[in-house]
From Swiss-Prot:
Belongs to the MnmA/TRMU family. Residues 145-147, 307-308 are annotated as: Interaction with tRNA. Disulfide bonds join 99-195. It comes from Xylella fastidiosa (strain 9a5c). The active site is at 99 (nucleophile), 195 (cysteine persulfide intermediate). This is tRNA-specific 2-thiouridylase MnmA. InterPro entries: MnmA-like, MnmA-like_C, MnmA-like_central, MnmA-like_central_sf, Rossmann-like_a/b/a_fold. Residues 94-96 are annotated as: Interaction with target base in tRNA. GO terms for cellular component: cytoplasm. The record marks 124, 340 as: Interaction with tRNA. Its EC number is 2.8.1.13.
Length: 379
């Protein structure tokens, strides 16, 4: 059998199936590789074996070699431990971004090269173009499925060795192609959520690793409303799962998480989705990553997303001496959350991004002041 030139990341889903089919139809020398990133805990939540069987079936239909690699140890060390540490620190991480950077476009790419390939391909909805002597990461043609947000940590070396064969397709087109090609995954439901959690209750999953630390739920005026099982189980803007019943002298309106203070173990809530405590027009990030290797300029304007599938928001970006960013938005933003990813765009091009560190939301400013006081005492 010929040494494959391209190794396709086979997830067992329809997207990677069509990615492999398209490359195979172009007479590329390819092979498929299925990654196991999580050891099944017995609840069958990741459906890993079912996905593996589907990946094997697709490779069989296409007549290409199938490979398997277990990256669960690497995933635990490089993605999951960070995920837990962020929640323990009161932040809301995005494990998909880290998984792409550390697993799919690092360990998977290294494995592909060990198998003799010079490129990898995945079923991501994104595009890569080469012009002006560098590689550019672009949004997928199907904006509703675009995954460039999760790929913003990639750099020139990874893009040079990567293909996104379905980036020019709309999802309905893709399913039609899969059906016409006789791929058994053509009607398979899209996976949602985080694999290692699956369909389980998120809070119950976290409790296995972060034991409950009950505390008070308060309103913006510091009035006690109820109790919570642990502030790290909640995120800004969250409405579900607060278990706040009828509160005396309060309207029967839903409650929203507007802040959390780890120092006092207090969860703050308000009854208005448009609460001023959820609004911000400025954020500071951790040091940024740039797809091109460097920022466009010390100060520049672009658009940004502070959460997946958010509309583009115009902003001004200032690069600080340590590589972190100060971002000023034209319009007020809702529930900008520390730990989540800020991703920057110039039209359809993804420039890069960074982890959100803090914002000018009222309770976030208070948390930052308390943290600064604590650090001064420790010093």
């Amino acid at each position: 059998m010929n040494t494959p030139r391209i190794i396709v990341a086979m997830s067992g889903g329809v997207d990677s199936s069509v990615a492999a089919w398209r490359l195979n139809s172009q007479r590329e020398t390819i092979a498929g590789l299925f990654m196991r990133n999580w050891t099944d805990d017995g609840n069958g939540q990741c459906h890993a074996e079912e996905d593996r069987r589907d990946a094997v079936a697709v490779c069989g239909i296409l007549g290409i070699a199938f490979h398997f690699r277990d990256f669960s140890h690497e995933y635990w060390q490089e993605v999951f431990t960070h995920f837990l540490a962020e929640y323990a620190n009161g932040r809301t991480p995005n494990p998909d971004v880290l998984c792409n950077r550390e697993i799919k476009f690092k360990h998977f790419l290294e494995t592909a090269r060990e198998l003799g390939a010079d490129s990898i391909a995945t079923g991501h909805y994104a595009r890569i173009k080469h012009y002006r002597q560098r590689w550019h990461l672009l949004r997928g043609a199907d904006r509703s499925k675009d995954q460039s947000y999760f790929l913003h940590q990639l750099g020139q070396e990874q893009l040079a060795a990567t293909m996104f064969p379905i980036g020019d397709l709309e999802k309905p087109q893709l399913r039609q192609l899969a059906h016409q090609a006789g791929l058994p995954t053509h009607a398979k439901k899209d996976s949602t959520g985080i694999c290692f959690i699956g369909e389980r209750n998120f809070r119950e999953f976290l409790k296995q690793y972060l034991p409950a630390q009950p505390g008070e739920i308060r309103d913006p005026q510091e009035q006690r409303i109820a109790e919570h099982p642990g502030v790290f189980y909640f995120t800004l803007g969250q409405r579900q799962g607060l278990n706040i019943g009828g509160v005396r002298n309060r309207p029967p309106s839903p409650w929203y998480v507007i802040g959390k203070d780890l120092a006092t173990n207090v969860l703050y809530v308000d009854q208005h989705r448009d609460s001023p405590f959820l609004q911000s027009r400025w954020l500071r990030s951790e040091p940024a990553h740039w797809v091109s290797g460097s920022p466009p300029a010390p100060t520049f304007t672009c658009t940004a997303q502070t959460r997946y599938r958010q509309a583009d928001e115009p902003c001004k970006v200032t690069v600080r001496n340590d590589g972190s960013l100060d971002v000023d938005f034209t319009q007020t933003q809702w529930a900008v959350t520390p730990g989540q990813s800020l991703v920057l765009y110039d039209g359809n091009e993804c420039l890069g991004g960074a982890v959100i560190a803090t914002t000018d939301a009222p309770l976030e400013r208070k948390r930052a002041r308390n943290l600064s006081k604590t650090e001064n005492v420790l010093q």
